[in-house]
Amino acid sequence: MVADDIEVVTKSWSGTPAVRWLCHADGSYELFPAERETHGTDVILHIAADEEEFLNAQKLRDMLEKYCSFMPTEIYFTDEDAEADKEEKSENSESREDGSADAKTAEKPINDTHPLWQKSPSECTPDDYKAFYRKVFHDYRDPLFWIHINADYPLNFKGILYFPRLDNEYESIEGQVKLYYNQVFVADNIKEVIPEYLLMLKGVLDCPELPLNVSRSYLQNNTYVSKVSAHIVKKVCDKLNSLCNTDRENYESVWDSIKTFVEYACMRDRKFYDRAKDAILLTLTDGSHVTVEQYSEKAKADGHVAPAEEGKDPVVTVYYTTDRELQAQYIALFEAQGIQIAVLDKLVDTQFVQMLESYDATVKFQRIDADPAAALKADGDVTENQTLVELFRKASGNDKLEVRFEALKDASLPAMLTVSEQSRRMEEMMKLYAMQTGGKEQAPLFPLEYTLLLNTASPLISKLTALVAEGAPEDASGKAELIAEQIWRLSVLAQRKFTADELKNFLAGSFDILTKL
């Protein structure tokens, strides 16, 4: 306790004599008659010597504002030292020449006895919600949207949850959900009351059914708490679905800001996913948004779905990019065929798509550089050429390079470097694990599996085939090697960034070609 002694002087309305109750630190107490002119109660704390910090006016005000900002009874705070200084300055002020007393400014309570969450949603305007948000959380930015909860019996709790605005992906997404008991602050971010994955939100919850002094063990084993938590999840999902269905334009405008939150929540709680799955959007390269179902319907309508196996539903491939600039060539090829490309450029996206695939067997995700031939190949026979295989293995410096031959619909592209979807996901997972554990990134146990895809419909590949054919001119071999090296380097450049040595060799090879023109 902060006080050695506590005095309570009280007088009832009935006019009976006042009573003074004095309690000591050892638990003993005394009762005395007292003098008090009006009815009411005074509580006087005699602060202990080692707790004198609680005599500081600013500390007391901070404590009152933290715990009692919304108490239903008005609280007035007076700093007697500050008031005395103010009166002394006022008496000496030159402005009081006639000696008359100025009207004393009416005192204002430090608390709001009618907080916004106690009102009906129909009584609150958007400006009310925004003002309350700025007041409580000291954020100068307006929230994206909010959820006003007014649960009746048997849950009997109220609150407002806000989706905060984030300016960039590196900004902290840790939220703040304040728990109140009959408008008295209890604690922040109690994960037993609100699921951990919802703690990225900001808001207030007033649960009068909870005891003021809550303990973790009590909350973990309390049926009421689990029902409150489930109801909050339901209200959040209902809000997402409502915005997606009835206010789609606004929902799409805020999707990029809430995308990480929704994906993380879906991964943490299958029930959340089941309720909110229809509100999950895919951002496309043209800036538009579609649901997974809408993407699937268009792919089926356009004939971009492989025939289904007997007795099974067709599997729709959702093609995506992780870097619109680096993978621009692949994007152009797909868009030329009318295939939509989703943008999944966040760290959490890799884990999220794996979760979606595990929940829905009719959908799979594939980056556009994994196996583009499946979507871009043309009809017709393809003839493999082992001489070209050896030529490109030599050009790449990798005698185990896998080389495939396909006839693509776009004849202008001679070759593409593809990377296995599974090996790339494994590498990304290892990088993410190293970031989470704070450890040093290790060399991958399974290196990325690259495949060079040669487009047999390309005139350049046809020319290269002729240069390595039997009966070609004597200088054809040197030209073939020069062309193969340049095709390989351009394929690498379209797939990833060059290393320092690769860049040096690319520049040297390009200059060599120019000198021979």
Predicted regions and their residues:
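Conserved ATP-binding N-box helix of the HATPase_c
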Residues: 1-2
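Conserved GHKL (Bergerat-fold) ATPase module
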Residues: 6-517
